[in-house]
């Protein structure tokens, strides 16, 4: 094996070096503290587990992003987690089994066989929060507000939010009695805003339903879109109108809480259609070609664990959050250099300083005081008689 092959990393897999790793860790603690202040409890999930659990209710997209291996002990297929959300849903449905609402949060590395986009990392640090047990728009407003509070904490500038609701398309598709194949084709056409294909795929439907499905292509824009949708989808089935009501309620409450936040609505945006069941949302910033935080409602995810509960939540990549955020992350700097010595009094002094939160670096055999600068030390312990004192490091 050539030397270059020993240090070469796969595409999309990166190592994080100091001080960037320290900045990410400080940000992780700050965000988890924020989540805790909202009542969200931290959970830790396995990096690898049986494939059936990882892919529950998640659709084919997650299947394609999951690295798969065979467990040498059981012979069963396992996967490295590509999304922590299904794991947290299992904790709520099967392990905790709470009757009332449950608020959970997490932060951990995930691994993607396929990146989200060409330039995306395949080893992001997924961080997010989930609220289980409440089906009202209030839960959606809470998790969206928490997501925005997280972005404010990181001081991410020029945030824009997209809002949609998969229940609108799903309700119309069911009313039209579309086959699975045609529904998927229509879904693909709507994502591309391919109006000619949408017209062709709905040509054999009753005129009113065809017109409403075609309307989803251009029902996108500002707050006025919701008023237009009320008119153009007036004859829609009750579930579609209920979805519009939910979306309007969420939008009004977000506008009241975050009056400076630009809101964009796209009723043909079906992000996570095979996974989400209600409102879907994503945050974008100029110059970044994909969402930096996203989420939505997914009420069916716990069914395979024997307990389907209403659920809504969001996630982000912590590394992206730190890269885009402008908040000052203050890292501890400097330290105290200690000579290589077996003196008992020195050891007691070192222990005391460390217990006080000081950074203390002890020289190894053969190291000279000149190595202190490389160790980022600005002070040193100097012996005066039987005592040791902290003194500035000589220039």
From Swiss-Prot:
Pathway: Amino-acid biosynthesis; L-histidine biosynthesis; L-histidine from 5-phospho-alpha-D-ribose 1-diphosphate: step 1/9. It comes from the Bacteria. The keyword Kinase does not apply. Pfam families: tRNA-synt_His (PF13393). GO terms for cellular component: cytoplasm. It is found in: Cytoplasm. CDD domains: HisRS-like_core. Disulfide bonds: none annotated. HAMAP family: HisZ (MF_00125). NCBIfam families: hisZ_biosyn_reg (TIGR00443), PRK12292.1-1 (NF008935), PRK12292.1-4 (NF008937), PRK12421.1 (NF009086). This is ATP phosphoribosyltransferase regulatory subunit.
């Amino acid at each position: 094996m050539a030397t270059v092959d020993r240090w070469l990393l796969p595409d999309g897999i990166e190592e994080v070096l100091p001080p960037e790793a320290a900045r990410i860790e400080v940000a992780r603690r700050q965000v988890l503290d924020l989540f805790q202040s909202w009542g969200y409890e931290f959970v830790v999930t396995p990096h690898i587990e049986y494939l059936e659990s990882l892919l529950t209710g998640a659709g084919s997209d997650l299947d394609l992003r999951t690295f798969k291996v065979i467990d040498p002990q059981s012979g069963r297929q396992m996967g490295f987690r590509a999304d922590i959300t299904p794991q947290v849903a299992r904790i709520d449905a099967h392990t905790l089994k709470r009757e009332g609402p449950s608020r959970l949060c997490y932060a951990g590395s995930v691994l993607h066989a396929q990146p989200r986009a060409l330039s995306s990392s395949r080893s992001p640090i997924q961080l997010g929060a989930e609220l289980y047990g409440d089906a009202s728009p209030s839960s959606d407003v809470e998790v969206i507000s928490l997501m925005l509070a997280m972005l404010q904490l990181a001081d991410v500038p020029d945030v824009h939010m997209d809002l949609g609701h998969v229940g609108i398309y799903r309700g119309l598709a069911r009313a039209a009695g579309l086959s699975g194949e045609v529904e998927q084709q229509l879904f693909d056409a709507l994502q591309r805003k391919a109006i000619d294909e949408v017209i062709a795929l709905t040509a054999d439907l009753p005129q009113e339903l065809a017109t409403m499905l075609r309307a989803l292509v251009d029902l996108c824009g500002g707050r006025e879109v919701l008023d237009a949708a009320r008119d153009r989808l007036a004859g829609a089935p009750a579930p579609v109108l209920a979805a519009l009501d939910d979306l309007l309620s969420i939008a009004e409450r977000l506008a009241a809480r975050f009056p400076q936040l630009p809101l964009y609505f796209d009723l043909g945006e079906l992000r996570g259609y095979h996974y989400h069941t209600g409102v879907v949302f994503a945050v974008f910033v100029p110059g970044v070609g994909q969402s930096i935080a996203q989420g939505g409602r997914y009420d069916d995810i716990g069914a395979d664990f024997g307990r389907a509960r209403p659920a809504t939540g969001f996630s982000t990549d912590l590394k992206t959050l730190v890269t885009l955020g402008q908040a000052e992350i203050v890292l501890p700097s400097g330290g105290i250099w200690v000579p290589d010595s077996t003196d008992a009094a020195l050891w007691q002094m070192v222990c005391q300083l460390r217990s006080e939160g000081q950074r203390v670096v002890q020289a190894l055999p053969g190291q000279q005081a000149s190595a202190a600068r490389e160790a980022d030390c600005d002070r040193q312990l100097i012996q005066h008689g039987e005592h040791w004192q902290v003194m500035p490091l000589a220039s």
